[in-house]
Amino acid sequence: MTEQESPAVISGAARSAGSAGSAASAGSAGSAGSAGSAGSAGSAGSAGSAASVANDRTEQDADAIVVGAGPAGSAAAFYLAQAGLDVLLLEKAAFPREKVCGDGLTPRAVKCLAKMGVPTSENDGWLRNKGLRIIGSGVRIEVPWPELSNYPGYGLVHTRLGFDEAVARTAERAGARLLERTAVTGPVLDERSGRIVGVTAVRQDGSTPREERARVYRARLVIAADGNSSRLSVAMGLRKRDDRPMGVAVRTYYTSPRHDDDYLEAWLDLWDGDRLLPGYGWIFGVGDGTSNVGLGLLNTSDAFQNTDYRALLGRWLAGMPRDWGFTEENRTQPVRGAALPMGFNRTPHYTRGMLLVGDAGGMVNPFNGEGIAYAMEAGEIAAEVIAQALTKRSAAASERLLLGYPQILRNAYGGYYTLGRVFVRAIGHPELMKFATRHGLPHPVVMRFAMKLLANLTEPRGGDAADRVINALSKMAPGA
């Protein structure tokens, strides 16, 4: 690629969403690393003097800083390290740490883990599943994961307590410098350009007074992977979009004989009194003697703001067979909740030296509430863009590549997320939801199509009629 080429050119290498980062590792890893070292931390794209910067650099300086070691941040750090870059991965908690999640992983997420080499054997605490069992309107149907050339034919379940650490340690083994108990408190901005050139953070080691532990970490580029609230994004002036869907999920764990179920189970009949709610309940066996049980709802219903979700979960579970074990005495954890930021609800995904990935950029799939796969894919794409940008000899050429990052994301997910927003609005109408479950669930062909659409699992080229229809609709829909 020449210095004058458009940043959109790299989208071909970055896309085919599951193979997002081929160019990151291919993008001249050695030269990417040296170019990263060559640039002054305070000047986003200047070539500078490699020797001077190398001599001046401290352990608190890096080519790139990633804020947050969830799936998005750890994936980004992994691919940055693989590209030969010096990357700091800052995590406010200490592993292992808890996150609210259903713990179920589709084949799309499994592919991301396999690509990084994350160990996922049963001995490491991972439980395989065959597909999705859907229950609604008196119908019960099992839909296996589709057989596709570009995805594995199985899903996984693993608690987030262990999942996030497994991915973060994989990034660490690749060369990322992981700093736990390091809470980022704000951006460091260049006074002249307003660009982010680092972050301030507090090391929560408990050994000295708080004010003496505040430190400055500097880098040419920063990735915000700090979750739904993304304080770093807010400090940089980015707010959530009100025209994007939002979900909420609550979950807990029970000891249960269903802990080793080889299907993920989704219940579509979520009633609050006489109101059918837009969302679903889930029962995912974890394989360790417990099941993850929870529910997720969308903000397209009038009930969104005035529903007690914990009470709703209790009422739903009260109707389950008692021998499944979902009783108060078998509950092993508190009921916890979290927001699900969907369909690119915070934009732009690049501004003044900062790239957004995962929940910080609102990358949850509106169709099914899945966030991990898209977080990890976006982390890979962001790393690829950074690795290529840091090889450029001029600030202008580097910036052109970085400015192309949001368009790469729109090309990959924009049309599909637009379809998802239409879907979210539609199921906000109870009568339409009833019609869809009553007339769709009894038909296996319809449900196989729905599985591919909702999980975003298709052959990228060719495939069956369902693949071609879904791919065509995603391409025709305007970008998110």
List each language-model region with its residue ranges:
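Long, intrinsically disordered low-complexity tandem-repeat segments
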Residues: 14-52
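Beta1/beta-strand and adjacent pyrophosphate-binding region of the FAD-binding site
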Residues: 55-72
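A conserved beta-strand/loop capping segment in the N-terminal third of enzymes
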Residues: 110, 115-165
